[in-house]
Amino acid sequence: MAEKVNVCIVGSGNWGSAIAKIVGANASALPEFEERVTMFVYEEMIDGKKLTEIINETHENVKYLKGHKLPTNVVAVPDLVEAAKNADILIFVVPHQFIPNFCKQLLGKIKPNAIAISLIKGFDKAEGGGIDLISHIITRHLKIPCAVLMGANLANEVAEGNFCETTIGCTDKKYGKVLRDLFQANHFRVVVVEDADAVEVCGALKNIVACGAGFVDGLKLGDNTKAAVIRLGLMEMIRFVDVFYPGSKLSTFFESCGVADLITTCYGGRNRRVSEAFVTSGKTIEELEKEMLNGQKLQGPPTAEEVNYMLKNKGLEDKFPLFTAIHKICTNQLKPKDLIDCIRNHPEHM
């Protein structure tokens, strides 16, 4: 890497802006980093003014993180290649569906020895069905290593400076330290593990379980039932990783990316909220998305669909009754009230 490490944040939504507060402060304070951090901002007009200009003049992302000042060394750039061309570390934090297109734009335009880290929770659809990990897509397209950062990190709470933990999954030890230095803060504690695939898979699977937790809330079944759904969800997450990404360590599931993120998503988070409304309102998931999420997309139902495709292919649906039932409820093959019958005789109880 260059003498001073250049950093670019690809994305400037709610989570991207929250992480920019930490990364910007660290780049400014630590001698190994170049102070100026570029942040790719999709250009849009806010009250007749460009969003990048507003951010660079007021140091606030008024659209996605209102009321929080960004460090003055974080510079909004509307051109993706311009933002990324000098970076030694590329932080990807955009909705996962943009990744293939962004990678095409960046191919051959970035430093060949750069590294990436993905903060993106969710999968892409693999060709022919099933799931493709975002970090794998980035590595495949850009021919650079890609670590992941996942944890119980609701963006607004991170921006507020409330204490939390996060997990970095990085298969190559030599990058672990520089990544930890970049993200670690007094209120944002980082644990680095080598089990990158398990860290990333946890970040996507927990959204399925959160839908189940939301159904339980909508049915008003109480805390004991919700705890059972969360526990069985964790067991199915562990089993899924065991089947499709063998070689992972059990201890990874007890890091922030696993059990902690699962809990926070099943009590807060949009997948839970919309799933509860799905039960109480009688509206479709699509209608509720439009009404409740201000243009954001739910990750739980599409992830459940891809996971179900993989389980079906291996004849494993009956070994994952919670994942299977949640998928069937999201696609109207089952009623929400059928959820409990589906998990009453879970393989865990046999």
Curated annotation (Swiss-Prot):
Pfam families: NAD_Gly3P_dh_C, NAD_Gly3P_dh_N. Coiled coil: none annotated. SUPFAM superfamilies: 6-phosphogluconate dehydrogenase C-terminal domain-like (SSF48179), NAD(P)-binding Rossmann-fold domains (SSF51735). Keywords: Cytoplasm, NAD, Oxidoreductase. Transmembrane segments: none annotated. Pathway: Phospholipid metabolism; alpha-glycerophosphate cycle. Substrate binds at residues 121, 270-271. It is found in: Cytoplasm. It is an enzyme of class 1 (oxidoreductase). GO terms for biological process: carbohydrate metabolic process; glycerol-3-phosphate catabolic process; glycerophospholipid metabolic process. Homodimer. This is Glycerol-3-phosphate dehydrogenase [NAD(+)], cytoplasmic. The lineage of its organism: Eukaryota, Metazoa, Ecdysozoa, Arthropoda, Hexapoda. The gene is Gpdh1.
